[in-house]
Amino acid sequence: MHRWSRLLGLLPAAGITVFLFSPGVSAKHAQGSDPGALAELRQAVNVELEASRTDKSIWTYRESNITPEKNAVYTTIETSQGTLRRLIELNGHPLSPQATEVETHRIHNYVSDPAAQAKARKAAQHDDAQATEMTKMLQDAFIWTRGGETEDLLTLNYRPNPDFDPPDMQSRVMGIMAGQMIISKDSHRIRTLRGKLSDDVRIGWGLLGKLDRGGTFDVERRMVGDGRWQITETHVHIGGHALIFHTIGQQEDDVKTEWKPSTAHTLQEAEQQLNAGK
């Protein structure tokens, strides 16, 4: 539910999970890293992994999602059984009565479909497992150095580790990212992760497609209440082309606001609350 284990998994590009690792990847230690920066990274990662394991809090929030195709606003309610969200605005306008009815039926059909819920849970577990494997490899995939520092925040800079041996296309994309991680000094929580493709990524030697150098991502996390940290903003702008005619990549800005603890313990309760607020 927007824990650290999901953080880097939120950066898909062109159908490729930007930070996706195979569990058996072999990587050489990043010899060029600053030992102090590595120590800060390890501490922050350990804190995030522990919080991801123990934090079972559930939330409700308003989500604005902008892509080239649409500008959508949702109300989202988390439960211990899963998450529901209801579309409430589209392209700057409230839903029509007909569209509202479609949303009501869509949500009810999902709540009434155990197979669909099981599929969603399985996908989430798969994403979490991949993200956990990736997290453990951060110190090897990049060279880390200390950047700026304020009273409250520490910035770590990262760049590709030339000794990292990517086993597949997904980790190859990761291998050319460079950027910053900003850590909250008092809690050792990761506040910001941003990066940029430092080179083009050619798929199938460029015959199948290419992701363009300069593509960026920015994931922001904040404390939303009771010491809990959540992803509040995700911005992904990665472009490219597949074959000759098709545009690939991702252009998305997702912002979550109005965080409150969720009082819905089941999907049925979340459905009732979403319907009451429609």
Task: Show where each model-derived region lies.
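N-terminal signal peptide c-region/cleavage motif recognized by signal peptidases
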Residues: S22-V25
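Structured extracytoplasmic
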Residues: A27-M177, D186-R191, K196-G214, E220-G225, ...
